[in-house]
């Protein structure tokens, strides 16, 4: 779509600072529902063009930008949400910053890419709820692990006669947290059952040896149920498991390696899946052993397994049928 105007929005907790690129006009509104309506009214009057010809751009700032994205979707506006790091690196060397300048820089970024961008598609409510539940579960699991580690170390530093209360309270906390984690798991199952498309992809992904429940759920929310990524290589790059060359002319001949710019949570989950697949999937075990026997580094081979697992995930989702181990048909 050809856009006639671009508006950059700097999102903060309390306010939205907006800048119209070609008119060089600035405004500030509250980060509330009334503020969103005021922003769209201002944009309509100030640009003088139809709203379907206007592209809005703002940074992805979590819950502060989510409500704005919901309002934009409801009003059928064209908008993109972009990571702040991408905008920052695209503008070259910059000095100084404030909300107005940030809005102008966001507008400049969007204007340069207005002909190549794909407007943002807000995930369905079920995916957003799974994301919130997984985040809560992660916090509860970390707390539980903290108490378990404390209990394990307690006997080394305190006499058993003096630690009765300390042990009792922490054991009760572990039991309470375990119950809350179970509640969260049941709620996730309820959300899955309410959305057939998500449940279908969840079952397909977990049919792959080595890919467990948490990884399958995280892949679904990261890919917007496989609508935001159409290729496993793009997701591999996003997860930080895609190898990139590191050479330049005759002076730099570095090793091919993965980028530190990555979704570290997804990368960690894929690493655990790769280790599990090597242990339990004969085909992956053979593939891993063959690479190491060729002299490949262990982590290099594990990374290759991570990429193969992502390829399998996209294959089963695209095909719409569970993974079938080929080794069981081998002669």
Residue ranges of model-derived segments:
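Phosphate-backbone recognition surface of nucleic-acid-processing proteins
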Residues: 207, 213, 217-298
């Amino acid at each position: 779509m050809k856009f006639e105007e671009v508006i950059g929005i700097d999102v903060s907790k309390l306010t939205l600072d907006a800048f119209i690129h070609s008119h060089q006009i600035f405004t500030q509104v509250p980060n509330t529902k009334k503020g969103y309506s005021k922003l769209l009214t201002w944009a309509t009057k100030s640009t003088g063009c139809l709203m379907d010809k206007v592209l809005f751009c703002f940074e992805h700032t979590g819950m502060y930008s989510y409500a704005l994205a919901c309002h934009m979707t409801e009003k059928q506006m064209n908008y993109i949400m972009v990571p702040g790091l991408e905008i920052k690196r695209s503008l070259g060397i910059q000095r100084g910053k404030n909300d107005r300048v940030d809005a102008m820089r966001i507008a400049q970024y969007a204007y340069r890419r207005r002909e190549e961008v794909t407007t943002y598609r807000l995930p369905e409510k079920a995916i957003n709820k799974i994301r919130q539940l997984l985040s809560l579960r992660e916090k509860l699991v970390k707390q539980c692990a903290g108490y378990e580690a404390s209990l394990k170390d307690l006997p080394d530093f305190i006499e058993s006669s003096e630690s009765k209360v300390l042990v009792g309270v922490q054991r009760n906390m572990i039991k309470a947290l375990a119950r809350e984690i179970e509640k969260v798991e049941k709620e996730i199952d309820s959300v899955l059952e309410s959305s057939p498309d998500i449940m279908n992809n969840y079952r397909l992904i977990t049919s792959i040896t080595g890919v467990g429940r948490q990884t399958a759920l995280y892949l679904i929310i990261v890919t917007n149920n496989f609508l935001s990524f159409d290729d496993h290589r793009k997701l591999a790059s996003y997860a930080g498991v895609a190898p990139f060359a590191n050479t330049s002319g005759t002076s730099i001949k570095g090793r091919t390696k993965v980028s530190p710019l990555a979704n570290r949570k997804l990368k960690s989950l894929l690493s655990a899946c790769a280790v599990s697949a090597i242990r339990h999937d004969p085909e992956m075990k053979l593939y891993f052993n063959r690479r190491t026997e060729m002299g490949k580094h262990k982590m290099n081979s594990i990374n290759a397994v991570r990429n193969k697992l992502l390829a399998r995930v996209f294959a089963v989702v695209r095909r719409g049928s569970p993974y079938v181990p080929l080794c069981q048909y081998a002669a």
